């Protein structure tokens, strides 16, 4: 838990615009402590409705998209990874999330992330990062995300 607190302190200072980052695959792009940057986008009920349809979610709780589904916010963790590191075939392994509040139609969604681990396991290259999703600067979701960014099979073909 201490690592999350440290990572979030770093994230508060991030303010990096992903569009200015070179999309790269070198190891330095995934080094522990690397800030993946901050993305900002408006959240609208229309986007929420599209997500609910794609996810086949029909709970009235989300008010036809006016309240953001947690899956929509979690997907931003994938996007921030893809926006920073060139990805070929990759695998979303696991996410551990905490919900802190709601994101509503018309609010600005902001996603921040920082690398906490970059390891090789069973031949797979795995990156772990802490992330936050904010709704108009209020914490809505935080979590940790694990992804195999280079599967063993891809590495074996590349090195053959």
Write out the residue ranges for each language-model feature:
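Short structured motifs
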Residues: 94-100, 114-115
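HotDog/MaoC-like acyl-thioester-processing domains
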Residues: 1-31, 103-108, 112-160
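A beta-strand/beta-hairpin structural motif
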Residues: 92-96, 144-146
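Short, well-ordered coil↔helix boundary/capping segments
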Residues: 71, 97-105
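Hot-dog-fold acyl-thioester-processing enzymes
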Residues: 7-94, 154-160
